[in-house]
Amino acid sequence: MSSLPLLPATVIGSWSFPGWYARFCEDATRQPELFGADDREEAVRDAVRLAIEDQLRAGADLITDGEMQRVDFNLGFYDYLEGLRPLPQARRWGPPAHDQRSRYLCVAPLAAPRGLGLVEEYRRVRTLTAAPLKVPVPGPFTLAGCLQGGDVYRDRLEITEALLPLVNREMKTLVLEGVTFLQLDEPSFACRPDRPEEFLDLIARTVEGVSAFISLHMCFGNFRARAVGHRSYRPLFPHLARAAVQQLALEFASREMAEIELAREIRPPMGLAAGLVDLKNTWIEPPDLVAERLRTVLKYIDAERVHVTPDCGFSQTARFIATKKLAAMVEGVRLVRQQLTS
């Protein structure tokens, strides 16, 4: 991470789909016969290229591929898993909510003989940019949230145990490909904070043997810009500060910086990626406000251990808003960085 400046500005993972690409994804799902393999790859590459350009134009120091090949941040991975049967959607009408996401039934032991698709994503984005990259990886507990055990697994924890080695193997393969920064996405733990010691054990085994800088992202849900849990990290501390990762990526902006004092409990060498832009709000934060929020963060943790991010990924945000929010965030960071280094 030595190549990054003080207070690196970055995204969490996903970028907003361009309108044309969102339409392509819908059509490719409904009428797959309309597109060949080359057509699909061309569309994905063009979308990734735009995601890269948007992030770099805004001034981000560390970027992703925008998760352009994924559905939300984790739903696309079920296509790589064997042993699942899709379940019918119980509610199709009315206001969108988490119950309208895809659901699957486990009908055989879970396996991923082709991996989870992350290596292909990384190889593609590496051909398109030499910029510093991080790769978000869905955590096994969060992946288990859309699965029912059926006659194969007793409960969500057993499903998690089955997914854990698949995620671990994918992370190790990414490291062999040259990835140095991995982000483990486990928002479900923030929404179910009642078993913190069990959570720490699952995290430790998920990242065991993975030789990379690992960030642990825990928001409170952002499907259709809605949270899905009680928005407090307090039940997870001080346990969370002992997680077997190098950084915690946490949501603060949407909560008006509530609980930022918990950053005091994050001891070196662990760092904090502080969410300072609210993606549940279409209002564009002025750079001065981002700078003010960042100065608040620095009251509790030293600048050398801080990255600055939005609260969550941009997949649920219109692209024209996402570009403005990221640019404002970067400018707010620049103001504080200039103040600290002048």
Predicted features along the sequence, with ranges:
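Domain-level signal for soluble alpha/beta catalytic cores
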Residues: 1-342
